[in-house]
Design a protein with these regions (language model features):
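A general structural motif
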Residues: 55-57, 79, 124, 272-273
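A transmembrane-helix-recognition feature enriched in membrane-embedded lipid enzymes
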Residues: 1-46, 96-97, 236, 240-253
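Conserved alpha-helix/loop element of class I SAM-dependent methyltransferases that forms part
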Residues: 255-273
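Short acidic-hydrophobic, aromatic-tinged amphipathic segments that line or gate anion-handling sites
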Residues: 46-47, 104-108, 194
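Catalytic core of membrane glycerolipid acyltransferases/transacylases, capturing the structured
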Residues: 4-26, 58-109
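Short, flexible loop segments at the rims of nucleotide/cofactor-binding pockets, characterized by
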Residues: 35-41, 58-61, 82, 103-108, ...
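Non-catalytic C-terminal accessory region of glycerolipid acyltransferases
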Residues: 114-239
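Class I SAM-dependent methyltransferase core
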Residues: 276-277
């Protein structure tokens, strides 16, 4: 609501429109960072081993699990615009904001927006795209569309892969109003130069190879986070007992804590194997 009022006020001010949009993007960035920060029940972790600063414009690509993903990407840098889908573009709540900030809806194809995006890149902005096109229900990465890689080729922009983990457990696509405890992990992978032929020389080849790389890295993160320290597993276990009466529910809550979330079992039982209960 504040940002919508700000847009109404800024339209009356005798200031360059480009500067107004820059101020709006900065406020969107600060707002998203604040919303993530105040979620104290969520463990947040950001891994940026190469020290990426996002000062040089690039195409940011990320897997899409939850509405939170948008907040996470916009919190990375103020110089960022996004490619959105139909419902976000026409949203009565924030549609006007993202349209004023020069976000893009490419329902008619990326080809029509290349030159507009080129101008935005000249102003120092990066472009964020979810190559899957829509959120996943179960957290698994789906097939990548070629649009982001087509833009990278046409605009000669580097690609920065961003892996998002845990957001689908905090706010799932199927339950958008149910906010749960969990881990919000963001890992920024090394920048891939536009002229790097390691992942192929055409945007079709780069789509397949970079998608495979991101899926491999995401699988690694899933293995690392699948431990008893992840609050998601505790919540899932307790959820199985909430309809069995308050006594049994609270017994399970206390029992699991006393057993240190069954850490010993997690260490002893293999990921794959035949388990016999005798």
């Amino acid at each position: 609501l504040f940002l919508r009022l700000l847009i109404a006020v800024m339209t009356l001010l005798p200031i360059r429109k480009a500067y107004k949009k820059q101020v709006l993007c900065q406020l969107i960035h600060v707002t998203c960072k604040s919303l993530i920060h105040i979620a104290t029940f969520v463990h947040k972790e950001k891994i940026n081993r190469t020290g990426e600063t996002f000062k040089k414009p690039a195409i940011l690509i990320a897997n899409h699990q939850s509405f939170i993903d948008i907040l996470v990407l916009l919190a990375l840098t103020p110089k960022l615009v996004m490619v959105t889908n139909h419902w976000v573009w026409h949203s009565p709540f924030f549609g006007a904001i993202i349209r004023y900030a020069d976000f893009y809806y490419v329902g008619d194809g990326y080809e029509l927006y290349v030159e507009r995006m080129r101008q935005k890149v000249k102003e120092g902005y990066s472009i964020a795209i979810f190559p899957e096109g829509t959120r996943t229900y179960d957290g698994r990465m789906k097939r990548f569309h070629k649009g982001a890689f087509y833009l990278s080729e046409k605009l000669q922009l580097d690609i920065i892969p961003v892996i998002l983990y845990g957001n689908c457990k905090i706010i799932a696509k199927a339950q958008p109003f149910n906010v749960r405890k969990g881990i919000m992990l963001t890992e920024i992978l090394p920048r891939i130069p536009a002229n790097d032929a390691t992942y192929g020389t055409t945007y079709q080849e780069r789509t397949k190879s970079i998608s495979a790389r991101m899926k491999k890295e995401y699988a690694r993160i899933c293995r690392e986070q699948s431990t008893t320290d992840n609050p998601v597993f505790y919540e899932n276990l307790v959820q199985n007992y909430i309809y069995k009466g308050p006594v049994e529910e609270w017994y399970i809550r206390i029992k699991v804590k006393m057993e240190d979330n069954y850490r010993l079992f997690n260490q002893l039982v293999p990921v794959k194997g035949q388990i016999t209960d005798i």
